[in-house]
A protein has these predicted regions:
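PLP-dependent class I/II
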Residues: 1-268
């Protein structure tokens, strides 16, 4: 909404899945659409929400080369960078090379990690002086970029040693939740697929096969879940026409209860 409210049009470059079901960037599509629509402002998501990809250095380098060739300023949403699973590693987009450092506005926050979205504690990292001046000028007019005293102290606490301990323990909990959910989907939910996320606490399940076999709509599946207390989100908001977005940031006992209800009442 912020983009549209600013009078801009959104052009999407959809991710694609390879033969192993891993979500990938479509660099050719990205380059084509940037040229076709004369785009010079790109919003990039790393780690990706909702598919959970943690982009590796080669992938990030290829993406930044496309943006460099087309003279694009990049806003890199790295709000999920604390929630990294297994042995994956988040690589800040600005660390790829000097050009990436110059043309990128990186956005961070502790809201996802510590559940502090209501405190308005997000911040940006900008190295280019011209871009920095432009952002400062716009934010000073709206005051939207201003933090309050409480959010400042929350940020300090989050980035303390105690905060790091919390983050590490949180990732362990989420990893166990993901293990359970993926195993449950693969073994007990016929017609539902999901690629294991590498980061975030979101699942992006694909119900295409189930919808075709059951002759149901995604809306009907979503409603049947809500009717039995399963809170989930329509994946069409994320260009997944047969997908549902599920939040796994909760105790494992609740994850088990939710998936048991899916099998008993929804995917039947």
């Amino acid at each position: 909404n912020s983009i549209k409210n600013a009078g801009r049009n959104i052009i999407y470059s959809n991710l694609i899945q390879d033969e192993d079901g891993v979500w990938r960037m479509d660099y050719q599509d990205m380059d084509q659409k940037i040229k076709q629509h004369k785009i010079h402002f790109v919003v990039f998501c790393s780690p990706h929400n909702p598919c959970g990809r943690v982009w590796n250095k080669d992938e990030l380098t290829k993406a930044m080369e496309v943006y460099k060739q087309n003279n694009c300023i990049v806003v890199s949403d790295e709000i999920w960078s604390d929630i990294i699973l297994d042995d994956h590693k988040h690589i800040p987009l600005q660390s790829i090379n000097e050009d990436a450092k110059r043309r990128t506005i990186a956005l961070y926050a502790v809201s996802k990690t510590f559940n502090l979205a209501g405190l308005i504690g997000s911040y940006h990292v900008i190295y280019d002086s011209y871009i920095k001046d432009r952002v400062r000028a716009q934010s000073s007019k709206s005051h939207y970029n201003s933090m309050n005293v409480l959010s400042i102290h929350a940020l300090i606490g989050a980035y303390s040693n105690t905060g790091k301990e919390w983050k590490d323990e949180l990732n362990q909990v989420i990893s166990k939740n993901v293990d359970y959910a993926i195993q449950f989907i693969n073994n007990k939910l016929k017609g539902v697929q999901c690629t294991r996320p590498e980061g975030t606490y979101m699942l992006f399940i694909d119900c295409k096969e189930y919808l075709e076999e059951s002759n149901k709509t995604l809306e009907e599946v979503l409603n049947s879940g809500w009717d039995v207390g399963i809170g989930w989100q329509d994946g069409r908001q994320f260009l997944g026409n047969t997908h549902i977005r599920i939040n796994l940031a909760l105790p494992l006992s609740k994850v088990k209860e939710a998936f048991d209800r899916m099998k008993k009442y929804v995917f039947i």
